[in-house]
Design a protein with these regions (language model features):
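N-terminal pre-domains immediately preceding structured catalytic cores
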Residues: 2-4, 8-178, 182-222
Length: 222
């Protein structure tokens, strides 16, 4: 297969949702980080991991019908979109873990935490040799920020959070929900609030035309 054809196959799903125009956003300025952020991130050698260009933060064209201020997650393409006005969105590359596949539909951010602690579920402990509790810090797999999703006033156990493994951005791995680089999750965290609507696309839904049912459901949550 020609190189151009291969690239089309690899990134086709993201282009459908994200459009052809894209503009890379410059790295966050120091002003975006709190003194605590700077101290903890300075102790994290993994922050120097190289992120492939398609998974760096971009502003892209956006064809779906969700309202500005909505988060849309396309696990298939490994992208999270923060919808902007005028048919644009900020597109973030993500890592997708098995827990991210347990929920699809419309939810809201029910709570938000800076530098969260982590208590692994019993299911995760069956698969992995992990401690019962990990405190906040650069070695915590939840990273610098966490947003907890609720539907019908119940915790979905679905999270959007940072990572201590940025080298896996753009990939699927064995555990976790939706992981962004710590720089990106700090950026997203500043843009959202408790009550922000999150649309989680079902598998294979992200590369289809806009889904009126999901888009209208997101509108009803406003």
């Amino acid at each position: 297969m020609a190189a151009r054809g291969l690239l089309a196959v690899l990134f086709g799903a993201g282009i459908v949702l994200g459009g052809c125009m894209q503009s890379t956003i410059e790295p966050a300025s120091e002003a975006n980080f709190t003194p605590r952020d700077k101290k903890l991130l300075a102790a994290a050698p993994y922050e120097k991991a190289a992120i492939p260009e398609p998974y760096k933060r971009h502003i892209v064209e956006y064809h779906r019908k969700e309202m500005a201020g909505t988060i849309v997650i396309d696990s298939d393409a490994r992208y999270l979109y923060y919808v902007l006005p005028d048919h644009k969105a900020i597109r973030y590359g993500v890592t997708v873990g098995e827990e991210a596949l347990t929920f699809s539909g419309v939810a809201k951010i029910g709570s938000m935490t800076e530098w969260p602690s982590w208590t692994p579920t019993a299911e995760i402990k069956k698969r992995m040799d992990v401690p019962d509790f990990v405190g906040p810090g650069p070695q915590n797999p939840m990273g610098a920020r966490a947003m907890y999703l609720y539907a019908n006033n119940k915790d979905t156990l679905y999270r959007i959070h940072g990572t201590n493994q940025p080298e896996y951005i753009g990939e699927a791995i064995s555990s976790g929900c939706i992981r962004l680089t710590n720089e990106d999750v700090i950026d997203l965290y500043k843009r959202v609030k408790v009550g922000t609507v999150v649309v989680v696309l079902a598998p294979h839904e992200g590369d289809s035309p806009a889904n009126p049912r999901v888009a209208s459901a997101a509108g009803r949550f406003r």
